[in-house]
């Protein structure tokens, strides 16, 4: 048992107190050095469209080798599956442990056993719990029908599986490290949450619950990131994002909203810039 004046115990207590108080505010005037991305390897789950695709392209443009893990082909041209320096698609279902593990193993072979960045952006749209109940209850048999679980399967379970594998590989690779990597670089684990990680979105019960869960998952590992290869963890929680063409726009999760609603929309570029700042600045952890 550690003594009351044990320096290590004091350090751990101080770190816990710091996280309870919250991390310091980000200075957005500070320069972001994108050069640190050169030669790094990144995995982006759900990187074939939307925010994930935007982050994947930005990392690739800055010299990072990017592996996109998704069920779909990339939504835009330019993803070259034969060029190791371009985003490469590895098809997988993040809600399946076996599929996700196989994809991570493929990426490690492709990257010559290197992994520096993992961005967890895979997600699916919500179901309206009122619609589910009313449509299935009116004129139906008296036995309730099981509600769909795909939102939990992808948004929460898939994120947990992906985070688990990222932390496992970060830890494993550190144990094999030759110590030549720059001491200022830390492996990066970036969770993509949502506005729904913090506030309610009426009737989007499965989506809100899953995104609150993502935030809880991130907070549960943040204070012990040094145990997992010394990694740095952050959470981005985008609001409604303008990431579609035409008369409708979407949230970060892709759920459509009407342009007639009085909602201020963010831009994909804003979220991408935030993601790169989190990944490139080792002073940000929150």
UniProtKB/Swiss-Prot annotation:
Pfam families: adh_short. One of its GO terms (cellular component) is cytosol. InterPro entries: NAD(P)-bd_dom_sf, Sc_DH/Rdtase_CS, SDR_fam. SUPFAM superfamilies: NAD(P)-binding Rossmann-fold domains (SSF51735). Gene3D superfamilies: NAD(P)-binding Rossmann-like Domain. Its main location: cytoplasm. PANTHER family: 15-HYDROXYPROSTAGLANDIN DEHYDROGENASE [NAD(+)]. This is NADP-dependent dehydrogenase clz5. The lineage of its organism: Eukaryota, Fungi, Dikarya, Ascomycota, Pezizomycotina.
